[in-house]
């Protein structure tokens, strides 16, 4: 044997020590080069194999890491950390089954290894098996009480389970042990925001971004929080930052576009909408279905967006197992699921429905999936139901499991994929019959039925919906005929309106206002001397942007009047009487605000569009027998608005008819609407109990 051969082990060990020192200093590339030299000398050198795997994992090369960990395990099959690290890499790749096998093998080699238990918890957390994950994190912490990663991920799991106070304790323990780990500050911000402790949440997001300046999800969540806190400019800046860092962050592009629409920032609007369509056509999750409803003007694109969004939502509904058929109940158990069971537009519309249910035939349950905001409306809602479940802090899976325990027959989604999305409850199958009462093209197989009406969802739109139709004869939206209007109507001067000029009104949410409808409104102001446009000031940036747009169109910005939020709903309804004509938006109609105007006696002018949300107001007008206010083209809309603004007698006739129809036509006949909906529920239930296939349901007038 020559001297060179005799020195190979010593050469290899020297190079390994040099590589290890560089690795520990964070110099990954030169360290890797030295590990490779070691392996050229001794291909089975375990430490070089193992640390090459660690280095590859640190370099975001998981496939390369797997190759090296496999070689390391072949060299030393009993090395515990090699099995654990291989399992963590497999978790990163989403290969959870093999990862679990590695962690379990590690535990057979070292039964009290806290890192192996942590790995099992991580895998089950990623599989959204949160209860199982929690058990493993607890085992890890029983063995290693000062394990910061286990505390942090335990907090994340508790957050997913809706156990927010416990989650906060775990996350804060993790921060105390490892104060520079950015994800724990991010998770702390998320939990604090959910608890309504917004200022503290903001501090946590700030810290997360300070520790990781390219933390896109932290910018995204801080943007949402800034919007909630009415810091609108800061919110958009945060969304811009998130988009520049991670353009493919799920839903981010659509949310930023939605915010731009909300502040009426239009210079790049059409280009952004076109880009959104291209992203959805490529199958990218670029927007939530709610954001898409305002930005996309075809049912086909709205459905595509919804299907992509649902496909990527990883809710472990299978964890609950198959749904057992509940026994026939004396009263049909109907659960309404919403995060809006508080002072909210949805609650003002729907509370009358809940109060009018036939309690001899239906047992009504409220699943309140949002915050508990005490107030007059919350109290009224609690009285309206047989059972009121405050589930705001529960996870989607926990709520679905609870609904199964309660043997709910029919679960009604009364909110859809809004900001407080709880779609997971329905994906996890809380009831055997699930009903979409939000009206959007969900693309979802977890709803059996969608509530429809002849205008909002006409027969030729049927192909865009997977659900069977439960068609009501007049309107699919509930109203409350008991809504009080304050006796005193404020003066026009008090509302900032001219005493004599014609008042066009549109209290729509600002994201519904588009350049197309604004062009029409400005032409109307130009053609009707002394007229004004009365809008709702929904955020701090919208008035300035719209005034600038008016100026561009040659209209004095002072002719745009922005109403503040009224202290009480009854005061808002009273001030609506000051308007002469409510002019609707095109792509996304007024719903609650149109109902408000009609209840206050103000005519609503609308134009039917190609999507459900662009036909809603038409459905309301049809139900109050005012078809003469439904137009089919933008030109017709503009011509009729001008006619009503310049022909006082014609407008007076319209207002007189509205006053007469208000209490004698179906729109505000809450008991009648309730009977029709109950008819639909009964047909759904009887078909299910008889094991008949799901079919369209037509409720007759």
Question: Which residues fall in each region the model found?
Answer:
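Donor-sugar nucleotide-binding helix/loop cap in glycosyltransferases
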Residues: 583, 597
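Substrate-binding clefts and catalytic carboxylate motifs of secreted carbohydrate-active enzymes
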Residues: 505-516
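Glycine-rich phosphate-binding loop and adjacent beta-alpha segment
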Residues: 607-608, 612-616
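A conserved nucleotide-sugar
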Residues: 117, 361-363, 522-552
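Short, well-ordered beta-strand segments
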Residues: 333-335, 505, 534, 605
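Alpha-helical solenoid repeat scaffolds of the TPR/TPR-like class and their adjacent stem/linker regions
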Residues: 1-497, 509, 519, 548-555, ...
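Short Ser/Thr-rich beta->loop micro-motif in glycosyltransferases that lines
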Residues: 415, 584-590, 608
């Amino acid at each position: 044997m020559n001297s060179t051969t005799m020195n190979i082990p010593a050469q290899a060990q020297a190079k390994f020590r040099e590589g290890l020192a560089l690795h520990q200093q964070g110099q990954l590339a030169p360290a890797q080069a030295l590990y490779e030299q070691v392996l050229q000398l001794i291909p089975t050198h375990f430490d070089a194999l193992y640390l090459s795997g660690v280095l590859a994992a640190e370099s975001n090369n998981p496939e390369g890491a797997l190759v090296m960990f496999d070689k390391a395990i072949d060299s030393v099959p009993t090395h515990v950390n090699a099995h654990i690290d291989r399992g963590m890499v497999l978790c990163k790749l989403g290969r959870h089954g093999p990862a679990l096998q590695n962690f379990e093998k590690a535990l057979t080699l070292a039964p009290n290894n806290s890192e192996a238990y942590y790995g099992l918890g991580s895998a089950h957390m990623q599989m959204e098996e949160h209860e199982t994950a929690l058990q493993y994190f607890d085992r890890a912490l029983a063995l290693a009480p000062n394990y910061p990663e286990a505390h942090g991920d335990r907090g994340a799991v508790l957050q997913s389970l809706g156990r927010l106070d416990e989650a906060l304790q775990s996350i804060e323990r993790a921060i105390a042990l490892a104060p520079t780990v950015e994800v724990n500050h991010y998770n702390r911000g998320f939990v604090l925001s959910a608890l309504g402790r917004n200022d503290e949440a903001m501090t946590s997001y700030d810290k997360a971004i300070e520790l990781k300046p390219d933390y896109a999800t932290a910018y995204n969540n801080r943007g949402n929080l800034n919007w909630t806190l009415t810091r609108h400019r800061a919110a958009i800046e945060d969304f811009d930052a998130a988009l520049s860092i991670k353009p493919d962050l799920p839903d981010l592009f659509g949310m930023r576009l939605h915010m731009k629409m909300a502040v009426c920032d239009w210079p790049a609007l059409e280009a952004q909408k076109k880009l959104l369509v291209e992203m959805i056509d490529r199958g990218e999750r670029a927007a939530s279905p709610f954001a898409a409803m305002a930005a996309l003007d075809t049912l086909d694109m709205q459905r595509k967006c919804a299907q992509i969004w649902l496909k990527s939502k990883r809710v472990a509904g299978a964890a609950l197992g198959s749904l057992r058929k509940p026994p026939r109940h004396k009263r049909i158990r109907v659960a309404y699921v919403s995060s809006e069971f508080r002072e909210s537009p949805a609650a003002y519309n729907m509370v009358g429905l809940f109060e009018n249910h036939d309690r001899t035939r239906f047992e009504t349950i409220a699943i309140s999936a949002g915050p508990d905001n005490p107030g007059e409306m919350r109290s009224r809602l609690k009285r309206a139901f047989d059972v009121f479940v405050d589930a705001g802090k529960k996870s989607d899976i926990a709520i679905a499991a609870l609904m199964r325990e309660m043997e709910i027959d029919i679960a009604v989604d009364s909110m859809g994929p809004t900001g407080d999305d709880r779609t997971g409850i329905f994906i996890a199958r809380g009831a055997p019959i699930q009903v979409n009462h939000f009206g959007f093209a969900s693309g979802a197989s977890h709803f059996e039925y969608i509530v429809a009406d002849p205008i909002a969802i006409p027969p030729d739109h049927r192909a865009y919906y997977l659900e069977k139709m439960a068609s009501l004869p007049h309107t699919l939206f509930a109203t409350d005929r008991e809504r009080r209007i304050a006796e005193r109507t404020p003066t026009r001067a008090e509302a900032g309106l001219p005493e004599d000029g014609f008042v066009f009104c549109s209290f729509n949410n600002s994201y519904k206002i588009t350049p197309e409808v604004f062009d029409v409104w400005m032409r109307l102001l130009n053609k009707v001397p002394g007229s004004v446009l009365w809008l709702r000031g929904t955020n701090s940036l919208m008035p300035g942007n719209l005034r600038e747009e008016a100026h561009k169109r040659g209209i004095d910005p002072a002719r745009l009047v922005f109403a503040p939020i009224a202290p009480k709903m009854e005061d808002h309804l009273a001030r609506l009487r000051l308007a002469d004509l409510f002019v609707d938006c095109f792509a996304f109609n007024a719903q609650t605000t149109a109902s408000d105007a009609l209840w206050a006696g103000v005519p609503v002018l609308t134009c039917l569009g190609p999507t459900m949300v662009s036909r809603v107001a038409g459905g309301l007008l049809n139900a109050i027998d005012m078809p003469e206010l439904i137009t089919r083209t933008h030109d017709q809309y503009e011509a009729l608005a001008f006619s009503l603004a310049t022909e006082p007698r014609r407008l007076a006739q319209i207002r007189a008819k509205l006053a007469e129809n208000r209490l004698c036509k179906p729109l505000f006949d809450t008991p009648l609407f309730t009977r029709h909906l109950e008819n639909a529920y009964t047909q759904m239930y009887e078909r299910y109990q008889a094991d008949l296939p799901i079919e369209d349901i037509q409720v007759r007038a």
